[in-house]
């Protein structure tokens, strides 16, 4: 144990040296057991450059739990079980005591309260309490993942940052009144093409991210260049962002190669005025100054680090997220999830009692959960002939254009040269065929793997009603017509255009949709 403590401390020492060498601002988030350790206190007070930041890391250990007068339930002083290591495992009153204990100790040591607090996940009650009482300005949580370390966060705002709902910190809010005014930045830098499908068919996903310990991702210069090209140089709407770094539990010997490669790259991009390097607190303050509600953002990846020709575009707003994927000569909407601030977290009022936590949003298209092997779920464009037969269309050579700060246009052609345009707005998306071929007959068609349970309850001409985890929601067709599957059909529903255009509203506000949870 003594050697483990030494390795953890050595890692932070080396990280401090590295950011100081390049005079970069950095944020060090301290778990309570590190906060009360004089070694870390002295190091960060005396060695860290003065434009860096010290904040809180909200993974709960025995010293903090016992300082709050709560019985420790773990077999060791640190465990990864969600109902012990995270705030979701405690009552609301206990969550507040845990915050008060940490804040008091932090102020005793550093003379002020932390502005930034991060974790793999912080529940809405805790985060709201941190803001209401201590006025934190920024938070961060884990990238989307399924089952990794026992933690599932799926369907959320992909990359960048969002204001969370007061009743569900994973769910972006739609209104100022319904949000916690603390932006949550998504950590770790997911591979825009490959992270989503990793581990499909297995109990948990692997990791393909900017984290410097991963040989085929954040440790690989080619992958880092590929990732940063998407973040720095491609269309992104309001802004783009990535978090670089690694928790010290991975130790310096495992992260040094990747981190010592990444930091000079970031420093060079900063000197070229292509990026700003900021503390988490600075980014949070900037976000709050610029955005009263969650903005629309995008991540555009049109080159493939693996040389397979795959491409992807992510769009996020406070109402929904959507993902387009070009893969192995095919094209589809791989993902669409709606956001609704009224969808309460299961952990809002009561503690979780298992070693996992699960957070979801409202699925419309789920290319991971509804796929099996090579049978990939997605919303595809199909051409229909007079006999009722169909042909899946592949849109290729995409051109991605920003129209203002909240509208993204993706233009592409099918194999016969028919142009299509997909436009993402904050509240809706549109798919239009621009072909001069007046009788071009096409549709959007949702297909999923056999045997997958879907949330759709009633399919109407203008709406698909759905229910997920007891919460009702609706996908509304503003232009076009929705068709139920016919007997023997291989699709879940089909959307036909009107005047060669389909418009889908993603605000979940149709009057006859009663939300219950």
Which residues does each PLM region occupy?
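Active-site beta->alpha N-cap acidic-glycine motif
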Residues: 1-50
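Metal-dependent polysaccharide deacetylase catalytic core of the NodB/CE4 family, i.e.
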Residues: 32-121, 179-208, 236-250, 366
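Beta-strand-rich recognition/accessory modules
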Residues: 214-223, 240-245, 467-517
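Surface beta-strand/loop "capping" patches
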Residues: 288-326
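Acidic-aromatic substrate-binding/catalytic surfaces of carbohydrate-active enzymes
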Residues: 324-407, 414-416
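Acidic, contiguous internal or C-terminal segments within carbohydrate-active enzymes
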Residues: 406-455
């Amino acid at each position: 144990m003594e050697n483990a403590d030494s390795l953890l401390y050595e890692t932070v020492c080396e990280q401090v040296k590295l950011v100081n060498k390049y005079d970069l601002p950095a944020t060090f988030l301290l778990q309570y057991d590190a906060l009360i350790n004089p070694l870390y206190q002295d190091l960060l007070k005396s060695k860290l450059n003065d434009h860096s930041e010290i904040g809180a890391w909200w993974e709960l250990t025995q010293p903090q739990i016992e300082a709050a007068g709560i019985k420790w339930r773990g077999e060791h002083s640190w465990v990864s079980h969600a109902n012990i290591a995270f705030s979701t495992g405690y009552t609301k009153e206990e969550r507040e005591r845990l915050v008060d204990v940490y804040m008091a100790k932090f102020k005793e040591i550093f003379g002020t309260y932390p502005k930034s607090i991060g974790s793999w996940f912080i529940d809405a009650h805790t985060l709201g309490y941190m803001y209401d009482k201590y006025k934190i300005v920024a938070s961060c949580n884990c990238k989307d993942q399924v089952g990794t370390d026992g933690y599932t966060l799926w369907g959320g705002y992909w990359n960048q940052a969002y204001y969370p709902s007061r009743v569900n910190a994973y769910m972006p809010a739609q209104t100022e009144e319904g949000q916690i005014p603390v932006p949550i930045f998504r950590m770790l830098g997911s591979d825009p093409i490959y992270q989503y499908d990793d581990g499909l068919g297995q109990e948990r996903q692997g990791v393909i991210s900017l984290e410097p310990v991963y040989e085929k991702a954040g440790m690989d210069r080619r992958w880092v260049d590929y990732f940063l090209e998407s973040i720095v140089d491609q269309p992104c709407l309001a802004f783009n962002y990535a978090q670089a770094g690694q928790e010290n539990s991975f130790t310096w010997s495992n992260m040094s190669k990747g981190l010592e490669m990444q930091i000079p790259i970031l420093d060079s991009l900063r000197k070229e005025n292509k990026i700003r390097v900021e503390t988490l607190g600075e980014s949070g303050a900037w976000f709050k100054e610029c955005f009263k509600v969650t903005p629309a953002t995008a991540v555009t990846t049109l080159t493939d680090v693996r040389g397979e020709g795959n491409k992807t575009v992510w769009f996020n707003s406070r109402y929904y997220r959507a993902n387009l994927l070009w893969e192995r000569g095919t094209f589809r909407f791989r993902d669409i999830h709606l956001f609704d601030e009224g969808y309460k977290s299961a952990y809002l009022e009561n503690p979780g009692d298992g070693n996992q936590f699960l957070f979801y949003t409202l699925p419309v298209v789920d290319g991971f959960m509804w796929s099996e092997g090579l049978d990939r779920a997605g919303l595809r464009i199909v051409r229909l002939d007079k006999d009722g037969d169909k042909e899946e269309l592949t849109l290729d050579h995409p051109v991605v254009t920003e129209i203002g700060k909240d509208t993204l246009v993706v233009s592409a052609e099918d194999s016969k040269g028919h142009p299509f345009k997909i436009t993402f707005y904050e509240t809706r998306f549109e798919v239009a065929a621009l072909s001069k071929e007046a009788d071009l007959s096409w549709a959007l068609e949702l297909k999923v793997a056999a045997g997958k349970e879907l949330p759709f309850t009633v399919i109407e001409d203008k709406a698909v009603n759905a229910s997920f985890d007891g919460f009702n929601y609706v996908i509304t067709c503003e232009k076009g017509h929705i068709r139920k599957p016919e007997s023997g059909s291989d699709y879940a529903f089909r959307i036909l255009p009107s005047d060669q255009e389909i418009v889908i509203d993603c605000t979940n506000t149709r009057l006859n949709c009663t939300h219950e949870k």
